[in-house]
């Protein structure tokens, strides 16, 4: 722009880049197979957790404590079994069987 006000002659309609810019990324990634195995192992470990189950003996009604290591999904399956036909028996009652 020349002067205080823009004019039509100052506007350039035919614009072309002055230099060609290579936008290709030539970066290469390292082999990540080892990382994938490590990550999946940590995920499997994270899935497993310790749970303490406190319930009553189905015969004498005494308190029975169980500690299990399980995934949350498998814990829900066990919960369904305990709410159904599966019964827990205390050590004293199991000796009398």
From Swiss-Prot:
Homodimer. Homooligomer. Interacts with host RB1; this interaction induces dissociation of RB1-E2F1 complex thereby disrupting RB1 activity. Interacts with host EP300; this interaction represses EP300 transcriptional activity. Interacts with protein E2; this interaction inhibits E7 oncogenic activity. Interacts with host TMEM173/STING; this interaction impairs the ability of TMEM173/STING to sense cytosolic DNA and promote the production of type I interferon (IFN-alpha and IFN-beta). Residues 1-44 are annotated as: E7 terminal domain. GO terms for molecular function: DNA binding; DNA-binding transcription factor activity; protein domain specific binding; zinc ion binding. SUPFAM superfamilies: E7 C-terminal domain-like. A zinc finger (unnamed) spans 57-93. Keywords: Activator, DNA-binding, Early protein, G1/S host cell cycle checkpoint dysregulation by virus, Host cytoplasm, Host nucleus, Host-virus interaction, Inhibition of host innate immune response by virus, Inhibition of host interferon signaling pathway by virus, Interferon antiviral system evasion, Metal-binding, Modulation of host cell cycle by virus, Oncogene, Transcription, Transcription regulation, Viral immunoevasion, Zinc, Zinc-finger. Its main location: host cell. It is found in: Host cytoplasm; Host nucleus. Plays a role in viral genome replication by driving entry of quiescent cells into the cell cycle. Stimulation of progression from G1 to S phase allows the virus to efficiently use the cellular DNA replicating machinery to achieve viral genome replication. E7 protein has both transforming and trans-activating activities. Induces the disassembly of the E2F1 transcription factor from RB1, with subsequent transcriptional activation of E2F1-regulated S-phase genes. Interferes with host histone deacetylation mediated by HDAC1 and HDAC2, leading to transcription activation. It comes from Human papillomavirus type 34. The keyword Zinc applies. A motif (Nuclear export signal) lies at residues 75-83. One of its GO terms (biological process) is symbiont-mediated perturbation of host cell cycle G1/S transition checkpoint. Highly phosphorylated. This is Protein E7. Belongs to the papillomaviridae E7 protein family. The keyword ATP-binding does not apply. A motif (LXCXE motif) lies at residues 23-27. One of its GO terms (cellular component) is host cell cytoplasm. The E7 terminal domain is an intrinsically disordered domain, whose flexibility and conformational transitions confer target adaptability to the oncoprotein. It allows adaptation to a variety of protein targets and exposes the PEST degradation sequence that regulates its turnover in the cell. Pfam families: E7.
